[in-house]
Amino acid sequence: MAASMFYGRLVAVATLRNHRPRTAQRAAAQVLGSSGLFNNHGLQVQQQQQRNLSLHEYMSMELLQEAGVSVPKGYVAKSPDEAYAIAKKLGSKDVVIKAQVLAGGRGKGTFESGLKGGVKIVFSPEEAKAVSSQMIGKKLFTKQTGEKGRICNQVLVCERKYPRREYYFAITMERSFQGPVLIGSSHGGVNIEDVAAESPEAIIKEPIDIEEGIKKEQALQLAQKMGFPPNIVESAAENMVKLYSLFLKYDATMIEINPMVEDSDGAVLCMDAKINFDSNSAYRQKKIFDLQDWTQEDERDKDAAKANLNYIGLDGNIGCLVNGAGLAMATMDIIKLHGGTPANFLDVGGGATVHQVTEAFKLITSDKKVLAILVNIFGGIMRCDVIAQGIVMAVKDLEIKIPVVVRLQGTRVDDAKALIADSGLKILACDDLDEAARMVVKLSEIVTLAKQAHVDVKFQLPI
């Protein structure tokens, strides 16, 4: 029960930390759950642990354009001079400058340059240059980025459109239906989570049979229900069908268009695009995954990806190294049960090497909040002696001074215990998980007290 309770919390953290910093995936989940879609099991979508790649807006818009979806004209600029040239090329009286950062709330964010807002309307190429100079190369701080902020390396310069009406459209995966679902609303251009909470009847859902695919009739019905005028219903439906094809082609887990609009010329346009891609499809979506912007990722997240480790940083002070996502979540829950707070989720997987274990310790100890470490391994496919070798090597090479509690069970566990005992290192072995969790929590409290008193503390193994 405790593990399942933590599961939902972990997914929320994963979404914010490692994947889409924007709120699109969560928003779609809340929209689905808001009215009990599919026999009141809509909230299950929030408990799907997925690793998602996120791309910058301009990259997503390029994919839409390639798919034949109608979007405003726009180009990416990596310098103020390029922004000036693009604004001049577009030739319109006013253009929009959009900061390209993987974080939600950019419109209300603040740059370290002092500029307020990551989306600006400008009225001349000169102003485009001036505004972009305050964005490019500067960090943008939003509610999602916190104090760290996110660096803005480029801006999207696009023509300004004057919408008559704004709509919301998204495609996401719904676990309880075991397939994709289209989501639409006449309330576009606003926070869709608020719409789902305040006016759930304004949200329309259309499940799609994954084998049959989307039917033109379904898209037409959805466009009509969303309130598109009769003269552009066909155009709206065509864009929806093309977006669904894009969704399947690139193994997306979510496409969100907010807003989809009818502009002053009567054309249907997708004004913004947020797309998440399933990281499990990386082997067959090389074109997409080569676009990942590592400058937008936390350093530890980058190191974890290089070592092929599943790592998510949290706010606690007890580092965790575990094999298997389920056991990792149960380990964090039992730490919480005994009054501690986990500093991370770290799953080394079922085939970890000595090198990966060492890299895992580097990740954990690079977090200065960590005051104690709990290793919890159940050796099935994983051999406990391999883990033990990695632990011994890491403690030696990294000169780890904080307490390390190790609980090993399973394949070659006796060999593993012998390796740890023969190492002469101050590694605390424990067979019982409950006892190990209680021990690591107490040790973290001791280290906390020592730090508060500005004294050192040394640990000796029990006789």
Curated annotation (Swiss-Prot):
Domain ATP-grasp: 61-288
Chain sites annotated for binding ATP: 98, 105-107
Molecular-function annotations in GO: ATP binding; magnesium ion binding; succinate-CoA ligase (ADP-forming) activity
Top EC class, one word: ligase
Activity modulation comment: Inhibited by itaconate.
Location of Phosphotyrosine modifications: 84
Site (Important for substrate specificity): 94, 162
Chain segments annotated as transmembrane: none
Tissue: Widely expressed. Not expressed in liver and lung.
Functional summary from the UniProt entry: ATP-specific succinyl-CoA synthetase functions in the citric acid cycle (TCA), coupling the hydrolysis of succinyl-CoA to the synthesis of ATP and thus represents the only step of substrate-level phosphorylation in the TCA. The beta subunit provides nucleotide specificity of the enzyme and binds the substrate succinate, while the binding sites for coenzyme A and phosphate are found in the alpha subunit.
Assembly: Heterodimer of an alpha and a beta subunit. The beta subunit determines specificity for ATP. Interacts with ALAS2.
UniProt protein name: Succinate--CoA ligase [ADP-forming] subunit beta, mitochondrial
Organism for this UniProt entry: Homo sapiens (Human)
Lineage, top ranks: Eukaryota, Metazoa, Chordata, Craniata, Vertebrata
Gene symbol of the encoding locus: SUCLA2
